Curated annotation (Swiss-Prot):
Three rho subunits (rho-1/GBRR1, rho-2/GBRR2 and rho-3/GBRR3) coassemble either to form functional homopentamers or heteropentamers. Rho-2 is unable to form a functional homopentamer. Interacts with SQSTM1. It is a multi-pass membrane protein. This is Gamma-aminobutyric acid receptor subunit rho-2. Pfam families: Neur_chan_LBD, Neur_chan_memb. Keywords: Cell membrane, Chloride, Chloride channel, Disulfide bond, Glycoprotein, Ion channel, Ion transport, Membrane, Postsynaptic cell membrane, Signal, Synapse, Transmembrane, Transmembrane helix, Transport. Residues 1-20 form the signal peptide. One of its GO terms (biological process) is visual perception. The gene is GABRR2. It is found in: Postsynaptic cell membrane; Cell membrane. Residues 21-260, 315-325 are extracellular.
Length: 465
């Protein structure tokens, strides 16, 4: 037993000796200690590497229920809106829509976001805070597509003032429907509207209004379109009613566009006018040149058909007549009538030649007098040639006032043996002179067609321009 007590005492002394030889640990003080204290080696602490405690948040977002609107159960919360239009990107006649890029800003007051501030300065946040607080649920009525820009981050800004006033701004591109009237196209003006409205809150919960009236809408002076002249931007507001939900405040961004006519003058009106004028060349071509006049008429008709097809391909299929349709189809009718004019001339020429052959077969002794008479009336032969063929020498050409009577008397004396043949001859060559003289139809067409087309243009441009 004494031996065991001695052993325990020995072990205890050994443990005390070992513990006394270990170095003592020092607490970290954040100060750099050196063996040689000097101001050359003294360093200030790096505050970026010092761990701070969690600061007390100024906006107590977690202390409130932001699923409810501000002042829930009370009067409607007023939400002011202003818009700055950055660009009007495109206008589509086929789809009847427009694309616009704009800055949309909302203003309202939420006392739950009020915070103490000695300097009365606001705090600015990005889009991450938007998901934690209440914001107005404004959407674009009749919108087809829209998105918030996200380069390089979501283009959303939230600014909160100490008294709870909130500014909520975002950059949006929206494509919306525009009801267009093309009855005066391309001499038309179009008025389009971008409409804003709360999706869930009626006018009893949310009062949407333009913050500064007409001054709430600002536009960039550099906005321009290739086919349109932007005439006016203005704002309006009214109530919209839905039978299942009630009345809603709706804001309108209205703008008026007037189409540039110069592009369509070059692409549509000028080519159509040239085709009509080209069809008139047929009236100066000899009526016996069938291939030339027929090919010219067919070419102008097909070209007009191509112009009409090209214009309609770039337009919506509306159920009413457009101004450009009137011009193109009237021009097409003029071109087509020039083809019909030659068809009539060619037919009458064929009928006339057939009658001449029959008369020559009945009266072979006329020695070419009837033929010479017809040729002179047609204008295909000169005066001296006609009189020479009729038996008159060149030295006996009569004055103008006696020439017609002389020739008629000559023909009448040649056929006085038969009263029936005399009546038929006078009826065929004097009574129907204009209708048998197919050259006269071309002569009258040279005046009637241009005069009618010019008259049509005067009426058209005075009505639609």
């Amino acid at each position: 037993m004494p031996y065991f007590s001695r052993l325990i005492l020995f072990l205890f002394c050994l443990v005390v000796l070992v513990e006394s030889r270990k170095p003592k640990k020092r607490r970290w003080t954040g100060q750099l200690e050196t063996s040689k204290p000097s101001h050359l080696y003294k360093k200030n602490p790096d505050m970026t590497k010092i761990r701070h405690g969690k600061p007390q948040p100024l906006l107590r977002v977690d202390d409130h229920d932001f699923t409810m609107r501000p002042a829930f159960g009370g009067p409607a919360i007023p939400v002011g809106v202003d818009v700055q239009v950055e660009s009007l990107d495109s206008i589509s006649e086929v789809d009847m829509d427009f694309t616009m890029t704009l800055y949309l800003r909302h203003y309202w007051k939420d006392e739950r976001l009020a915070f103490p501030s000695a300097s009365n300065k606001s705090m600015t946040f990005d889009g991450r805070l938007v998901k934690k607080i209440w914001v107005p649920d404004v959407f674009f009525v009749h919108s087809k597509r829209s998105f918030i820009h996200d380069t390089t981050t979501d283009n959303i800004m939230l600014r909160v003032f100490p008294d709870g006033q909130v500014l909520y701004s975002m950059r949006i591109t929206v494509t919306a429907m525009c009801n267009m009237d093309f009855s005066h196209f391309p001499l038309d003006s179009q008025t389009c509207s971008l409409e804003l409205e709360s999706y869930a809150y009626t006018d009893e919960d949310l009062m949407l209004y333009w913050k500064n009236g007409d001054e709430s809408l600002k536009t960039d002076e550099k906005i321009s379109l290739s086919q349109f002249l932007i005439q006016k931007f203005h704002t309006t507001s009214r109530l919209a009613f839905y039978s299942s939900t009630g009345w809603y405040n709706r804001l309108y961004i209205n703008f008026t566009l007037r189409r540039h006519i110069f592009f369509f003058l070059l692409q549509t009106y000028f080519p159509a006018t040239l085709m009509v004028m080209l069809s008139w060349v047929s009236f100066w071509i000899d009526r016996r040149a069938v291939p030339a006049r027929v090919s010219l008429g067919i070419t102008t008709v097909l070209t007009m058909s191509t112009i009409i097809t090209g214009v309609n391909a770039s337009m919506p299929r509306v159920s009413y007549i457009k101004a450009v349709d009137i011009y193109l189809w009237v021009s097409f009718v003029f071109v087509f009538l020039s083809v019909l004019e030659y068809a009539a001339v060619n037919y009458l020429t064929t009928v006339q030649e057939r009658k001449e052959r029959k008369l020559q077969e009945k009266f072979p002794c006329m020695c070419g007098m009837l033929h010479s008479r017809t040729m002179m009336l047609d204008g295909s032969y000169s005066e001296s040639e006609a009189n020479s063929l009729a038996g008159y020498p060149r030295s006996h050409i009569l004055p103008e006032e006696e020439r017609q009577d002389k020739i008629v008397v000559h023909l009448a004396l040649s056929n006085e043996s038969s009263s029936s043949r005399k009546k038929g001859l006078l009826k065929g060559q004097v009574g129907l002179r204009i209708f048998q003289n197919t050259h006269a139809i071309d002569k009258y067409s040279r005046l009637i067609f241009p005069a009618s087309y010019i008259f049509f243009n005067l009426i058209y441009w005075s009505v639609f321009a």
